[in-house]
Amino acid sequence: MPSMSFLILHGWQGSGPGHWQTWLAGRLRDRGERVSYPELPEPDTPRLARWREALDLELAREPVGLVVLCHSLACVLWLHHARVTDGYARAERVLLVAPPSPSAELPGVQGFFPLSVEPADVTRAAGSTEIVASHDDPYCPEGAERLYGEPLELHVRVVAGGGHINPDAGYGPWPAVEGWCLGSAEDGPED
């Protein structure tokens, strides 16, 4: 019987077989954990309303004690959700990996901004939320600390040379994120 439930949400264009999210979903399932790793609608041309509907369906199925892991544009999706959490169980922990900037030149990204979320919204949505990002992420040149960490009062773990923390940056298997999933909120994926 699974002891935890995990919801893994991909970003723009999804996460293919070589992505750390796909690897992580397999590792957690192999341990007998409950994992939902949905394909969000139209990942190449995402629309916030459609992605929110898909997230709402996932959250309606998930039990209390959910651990959520978001990559890239899914981080922004989660933050939109944090503004309106009525009727949904509070996530236990949330990890936002490589959130993009509104200036990122990705199709559909502009439709996810502006983002008007407050620290209290994030606190209501999850017991703990933290960010993992890199200073050299081409999709967040301003830096996740400046755009998200400071305004939302969230801890940002910096991955040196991590780029967008995807396969292009060497993030297929990522044991540190698996450790975060199975450990406490203090254990952090930094490499």
Give residue spans per PLM region:
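Active-site nucleophile loop of the alpha/beta-hydrolase fold
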Residues: 11, 40-43, 94-104, 134
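Gly/Ala-rich beta-loop-alpha elbow adjacent to hydrolase catalytic centers
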Residues: 68-79
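Catalytic histidine neighborhood in serine/cysteine hydrolases
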Residues: 33-36, 150-166
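Conserved alpha/beta-hydrolase "acid-adjacent" motif
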Residues: 105, 138-144
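Catalytic histidine-centered segment of alpha/beta-hydrolase-like enzymes
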Residues: 46-48, 162-174
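Active-site catalytic motif of lipid deacylating hydrolases and related acyltransferases
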Residues: 2-64
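Acidic catalytic loop of the alpha/beta-hydrolase fold
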Residues: 15, 135-140
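Short beta-strand/loop motif that positions the catalytic acidic residue
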Residues: 125-126, 130-133, 137
